[in-house]
Regions:
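Short secondary-structure boundary/hinge segments and terminal tails
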Residues: 45, 116, 132-133, 155
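Glycine-rich phosphate-binding loop
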Residues: 102
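Short aromatic/hydrophobic contact patches that present stacked aromatics
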Residues: 91-93, 123-125, 156
């Protein structure tokens, strides 16, 4: 599901296993995210396996966020999860050098617009104690919805 708007060059394109090196580079450009989770940076073969698994799940969408020929992020979300009519953002990853430039906000705006009429609620999963991510989702009108701490918190917004 590719999303574009006339006011922006930001768009998405479906990610495939061929895009694993690009996604791996995005992961490498966001080391603080993995430090926050106390998780090792995924290897390229792990990224490839994750994309293969996503391709087998008809409800899961993996997309590259692109602008002016540059990959500026990665979005992984699942439709009709956890309930029918929900869409859950599992990962919105923007390289550290590009954070706070509006890419995340614009990406979620495009996602929400594309889901209207197909989903009634968008959820965002926030792993660990990621205060910055929580502030980001609150700033977009999301509210605390599901407590699965210490591992995960979910934030939600009705469409």
């Amino acid at each position: 599901m590719s999303m574009t708007t006339s006011s922006s060059q930001l768009h998405t394109q479906p990610a495939t296993t061929d895009d694993a090196p690009r996604i791996f580079a995005l992961y490498c450009a966001a080391p603080r995210y993995f430090e926050l989770l106390s998780a090792p940076l995924p290897t390229l073969p792990e990224v490839e396996r994750e994309l293969e698994a996503a391709a087998q799940d008809p409800k899961r969408c993996t997309e590259l966020l692109c602008e002016d020929g540059q990959t500026v992020g990665y979005l992984d979300y699942k439709l009709d999860y956890p309930e029918p009519g929900d869409a859950t953002v599992n990962l919105l990853l923007i390289p550290e050098a590009l954070q706070s430039h509006g890419y995340g906000r614009r990406s979620i705006g495009l996602l929400e617009a594309s889901l209207r009429g197909r989903a009634t609620r968008v959820l965002a999963s926030v792993y660990g104690s990621n205060v910055r991510a929580k502030r980001f989702w609150y700033s977009l009108g999301y509210h605390f919805a599901i407590d699965a701490r210490p591992v995960l918190e979910w934030y939600a917004k009705e469409l």
